[in-house]
Amino acid sequence: MTIDRHALGFGYGEKAVYASDPWTSRGRLYDEGSSPTRSDFQRDRDRIVHTTAFRRLKHKTQVFIAQDGDHYRTRLTHTIEVAQVARALARALKLDEDLAEGVALVHDFGHTPFGHTGEDALHEMLQPYGGFDHNAQSLRIVTKLERRYAEFDGLNLTWETLEGLVKHNGPLLTPDGKDTRGPVPQPILDYCEIHDLEIATYASLEAQVAAIADDIAYNTHDIDDGLRSGYLTFDMLEEIPFLSELMAEVRARYPHLEASRFTHEIMRRQITRMVEDVISVAQQALSEVKPGSVADIRAAGRVIAAFSPEMAETDKRIKQMLFKRIYRHPDIMRIRTGAAQIVTDLFRAYMDNPKEMQSHYWVDHIAGLAVAAKARHVGDYLAGMTDTYAISAHRRLFDQTPDLR
């Protein structure tokens, strides 16, 4: 792995020709005047941070249920960590840091309470009505469900931020219109009818670094939380050569380090090596593609910000370890079963009696809706809940609520 340090950005100087430019943005769905003090991408980031959806991430599960302890990561702390890695990558590659950060900050808005378990349960309930997808839900939140402004629903974010939100994991369609990862969620197709996000092309490089930053952050920090919880041990980490090498490096330099500091020294090295790997791969890809603009990035037909084959294999092995040792651990599976029951019970209760939602907006706007629209309305309400609110709502409606501890 080699990095051209002379080509790195350090937060000053001109951006690369292939970086997104807020001054030539494709604009917003609803035209607004420009700000004399902030770029359009800075305004997007600021709007995202001030949303209700962002604050709710504090009490939404990353891996461990939010009530498990104050030291475990939540969706909010994970999101902040992703944004930090995304900014670091964007700075090194001379991209627009504000756009990369904005995409990172908004990427998890659509997650339900109880993480992927809640999403799976809600998807099952909504299956007859088009299902549920957290990425599509993120788009619904920032284009419709956040109600803050007098002249429009949503946040009226720039085209570039919305593109990054929808396409940060790659195109949703092939150039000839075929699905790349299963059917495109209907909310995304509906929005593209009025504001075409060009879902058959790759996203900007800013969006790509936000996506790879997500991988770096959650792999590293799930290991940290796994060690803290006891579901992982240092011996388990030794089974992965990359992690074993990092541990040997730390032991050689600090022979008698206490466990908590030892863990941190491993994690910081893991993040650094992964970030440097992505920078090296991106620099090589850019030298091959030779993009003269962000349009060339979108038309490149390949991911620019990615892991090397060796690091991709390490990433795969880490995911397999986390899946086996944590995500499928009997304790976690028991909690997941209870969490799924809470989401399922609440959905059925609200469909049977919408007044139980106990919110004037949600109750008033459900009257007269057809069954499919009613189900989506209930799904929107449920998806916005935090873990703690969903548990308390279930306790209010049912005699027995699953113990998620």
Curated annotation (Swiss-Prot):
Keyword Cytoplasm part of the UniProt annotation: no
Entry-linked Gene3D superfamilies: Hypothetical protein af1432
Family annotation (PROSITE patterns): HD (PS51831)
Keyword hit for Hydrolase: yes
GO molecular function: triphosphoric monoester hydrolase activity
Domain of life: Bacteria
Record-given protein name: Deoxyguanosinetriphosphate triphosphohydrolase-like protein
Listed InterPro entries: dGTPase, Diverse_Catalytic_Enzymes, dNTPase_2, HD/PDEase_dom, HD_domain, PHydrolase_assoc_dom
This protein's UniProt keywords: Hydrolase
Homology family: Belongs to the dGTPase family. Type 2 subfamily.
Pfam families reported for this sequence: HD, HD_assoc
All residue ranges annotated as the HD domain in the record: 75-219
Alphabetical list of CDD domains matching this protein: HDc (cd00077)
